[in-house]
Every structure is written in C-alpha cells, then in structure tokens.
From Swiss-Prot:
Displays ATPase and GTPase activities. The keyword Nucleotide-binding applies. PANTHER family: RNASE ADAPTER PROTEIN RAPZ. It comes from Saccharopolyspora erythraea (strain ATCC 11635 / DSM 40517 / JCM 4748 / NBRC 13426 / NCIMB 8594 / NRRL 2338). GO terms for molecular function: ATP binding; GTP binding. This is Nucleotide-binding protein SACE_2139. It holds the Pfam family RapZ-like_N.
Length: 292
C-alpha cells in the first residue's frame, strides 16, 4: 500500500546524541507532523494505526528515538520492517556528526553522554556509533550535521519532509487600537494614525473598517496607497529573510486610535494583497473591533 492507501506518512528519526534530534523534532512539528519522542518500539505500530484511523486528524506521524541498548536497536529494526510490510513505508532519518563536534557540543551544554557511564565522553560516543551502525546503514536519509547551522539543518529537513503548504510563511495581519495597548505578540507594528480619522465624520462614525463606506474613505486618503505599496515591498524583503532564518510565523500589527476604522480597513487591504504573493498564507485578526 502507498501513502494514499494507508492515509498516513510515517517517519522515524534517530541518530547520535548531540547530532540534532531535538532540532529535527521541532522542525517536523512546525511542518505539521505529529511528533512522539522516545516511544517504546513495541508501541510504534499501535501509534501509527491510531493515526491511520483518526479520520484525517493525523496524517503524518514522526517517532524520535533515543536508542541506548542493543535490544532496543534490534526491536526498532523489527518494527520498521513490520510497518513496511503493512504498507506504511516509514522514512528513516539518521543524524550524525564527527566525534570532535559531538564532544564540543556536549562540553558546551556541560552534559555527559547517555552511554558514557563512568568512562570518557569519547567512549560513550564510540559505543553509540557502534550500537547504531546497522540502523544507519538502513536509513533512507543520513544527515551529517557537523558543519550545519540550526537553520541549515532545518532547511534540509524541510526539503526532505515538508510540503509546499507546510513550508510557507504564515502571516497574521492584526488591527488594534492604541488606546487599548500594544499587542504583545506582534513582530512588526505600524502606526496608521497619519491618516484622517473617519470617527470625526458623523456619517462614518458608527461604521467600521469592514464596511465599504469606511474602506473607501480610508483607502482614498492621500498617502494610503503609497503606504500599502511601500509596506508590502518591505514585507517581501523582511519575509524572505525570516523564511531563510526558519521563521514560519509572522504577526503584523497595524494600529489606529480605537482599532475600529483606519487599522481595520488597512489590515483587510494589506491581507488581500499579501495573499496574492507567492509563499504567504494570510489571516486577519481585528483585536479591538467591537470594543467601546
């Protein structure tokens, strides 16, 4: 059976301690995988079966394994073969690095190797490398993280396990009123109070930025179009940089006095334009709309 037939993708992440398993797990979570850390091998098949019967709630399961004994390794190998026989076709990722780099990483965090015991750090690394040699030889993808930064490792994992949708930047465009305080979760904040306030237009006061009357008024003001064009150009630059650095969630906040007129109209228009840009998924939030 293929992935289409089983309805679920399965990945197994293993490798040497200090080679980047935690980073890989976080990246897979960001890509939409359901990640389980250190699940006993005998329970992996059950976990996958539950995911397959979740009616689409879980479509991608990744199991991150911290292998510490020979029996554990052999059990994992058997489970992978069993999953393959059932048609799940698990993709095995193995992470490694040179002894010198692994030693340096352990020394930086001042931790011992899980197999070190009373011996030297290098002995623990050697024991683990030997213990995992068979699993490494059977892996679908081996990544040497010796010379990779965190961002470079994430990029390689995205290439191997991501989809077009999961690697796109998710942008939240939020309107707010300064009278109610700045949004704490905003990455970028812009002040829209340079535009005339529709509040002072009696026939517009009771409307808001979602209404056509207010929208046309705000977008028709001198400077509104220039602001949108220039801000969108800035976001292309900033968004590309954030994407290279592995940032997949971006919150843009536009504020006016009460968060009812100017910021709402501009947020809706900006979101519409950004939605047309390749690589961005956009949603709008009007934090203070409806507040007195």
């Amino acid at each position: 059976m293929s992935e289409e037939q089983t309805g679920i993708e399965v990945a197994v992440v293993s490798g040497l301690s200090g080679a980047g398993r935690s980073t890989a797990a976080k990246c897979l979570e960001d890509l939409g995988w359901f990640v389980v850390d250190n699940l006993p091998p005998e329970l992996i098949a059950t976990m996958v079966e539950l995911g397959a019967r979740s009616s689409g709630a879980i479509t991608r399961v990744a199991v991150v394994m911290d292998v510490r004994s020979r029996a554990f390794t052999e059990d994992l190998g058997s489970v992978i073969k069993d999953l393959d026989a059932r048609g799940y076709k698990p993709k095995v990722l193995f992470l490694e690095a040179t002894d010198e780099v692994l030693i340096r990483r352990f020394e930086q965090v001042r931790r011992g190797h899980p197999l070190q015991g009373e011996g030297r750090l290098a002995d623990g690394i050697a024991a683990e490398r030997s213990l995992l040699s068979r699993l490494r030889s059977e892996a679908d993808l081996v990544l040497d993280t010796t010379a990779l930064s965190v961002h470079q490792l994430r990029a390689k994992i995205e290439d191997a396990f991501g989809t077009e949708a999961s690697t796109r930047t998710r942008v939240t465009v939020l309107s707010f009123g300064y009278k109610y305080g700045l949004p704490m979760d905003a990455d970028l904040v812009m002040d829209c109070r340079f535009l005339p306030n529709p509040f002072w237009i009696p026939e517009l006061r009771e409307f808001n930025g979602l209404d056509e009357e207010v929208r046309n008024y705000v977008l028709g003001q001198e400077g509104a179009e220039e602001f949108l064009v220039n801000y969108q150009q800035l976001l292309r630059l900033v968004g590309a940089g954030y994407h290279r650095e592995g940032k997949r969630y971006l919150t843009l906040a536009l504020g006016c006095t009460g968060g009812k007129h100017r910021s709402v109209a501009l947020v809706e228009e900006l979101a519409r334009r950004l939605a047309d840009d390749e690589g961005m998924m956009v949603k709008t939030v009007h934090r203070d709309l409806g507040r007195e």
